[in-house]
Amino acid sequence: MPSLRETLNGHVAGGHELELVLPRFDPFSDDAKPLTIPDGQPFSVYFAPCRWLPLFKKVRYAARRLGNNDSVPYVLRWLLNVFMLLALTVSLTLAARRVRHHGFTSQLVYAHNQYAALSGFLVSRLWKVPNVTRLYGTFLADLMKKPLVSLRYPTAAAGYLVPSDLLICANDGTRGDEVAQKFGVSGQRFRFWQNGVEPPSTPPDLSRKELVARFAALNPDTSWALSCSRLSYWKRIDRMLQALAVCRRQNVACQLIVAGDGPERDNLIALAKKLNLGDAVVWLGAVAHDDIWALMNTADVFLLTNDVTNRCNPLYEAAWAGLPVVSVSDFSTADLLKHRHNALLSEADDAETLGAHLVELCQDDALRHQLSMAQKELSKTFWSWEERMRVEVAELETLVHASFDDGQRG
């Protein structure tokens, strides 16, 4: 998760010592393999055993098979989510206490996402230090007018309702600020920040020929349309495949390069086969970040067709690389993407227009250059991750100093 990685690195760059407590298994995937962290991290990692998680994953998988479209029925989903919240709270809290027992003294507890919020609060009160909750988006904005939202979606609401000294919510287009306001979160302890962009330390200099040598399925003689996202249903990669089918019908040589992996991979490959797209789709799987930058600097078009929000790190990076965008009209990007200024936009489910826009950018060099220049201008308004984290670290240091002063007076 790039934003988590950059946050941790930013805290270390600010001169602070970190002890990261993680569940031994990824609670959000069905994979039963233990998590592994690459060596050489600038922080220490302690794993909470969470021996209950492998069995929980099996139960959740079985529950999913009971629903339609491979989704867990609502009542079962509610029970599973609440159980996971409470079980993670116990596991993470006990693990944090063991970390303390081993000699680590914390001046602040930072909980990443709603499932860690309650544990972060409990640990901070045990240790008498401030606590911060960090949320990476929400789906609650359109549900807030309905009754009993916090009861119907307790885990999603927990990030806002569990007490914290500072609540940081990503400005990712999911309108977390509206949710915070409706839950009565004080503006004094709420921060709504857009993620930063971390360009490569040196500009990518890989040519198309070199990328073809690295990724053999690439065709250097076609236009390249790039997608960078996890292959989840709400990312709607199927819309891109439908748009690519329009290109094929109009005999426009274009390859869709899909950088990313996820649970929808098999379904998407089946759809591509049904649409007779053949080698027009290149499934790269997970790709190193430096290679993403190289692809962005050699591709012709960036495709983004999400359902929930299209305001995301890959969009910022595409702007930084000057890559023209073909996307869907979306209120979350209304201030970033302007039709025929730096992007071509269609209605969400208008595959024909989406495809026509892809065809147009593949064929019109002048339009592509115009949109590229506008993208580079837009990128000048973005924070780098270094700038974004300097602001956050300053806030955290202020919080710690205020807590220390209060303790001295007490």
Predicted region positions:
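Membrane-proximal helix-turn-helix segments that form the acceptor-binding/catalytic region
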Residues: 5-9, 93, 97-100, 139, ...
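Aromatic "clamp/platform" in nucleotide-sugar-dependent glycosyltransferases that forms part
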Residues: 307
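N-terminal subdomain of nucleotide-sugar transferases
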Residues: 1-49, 104, 404-409
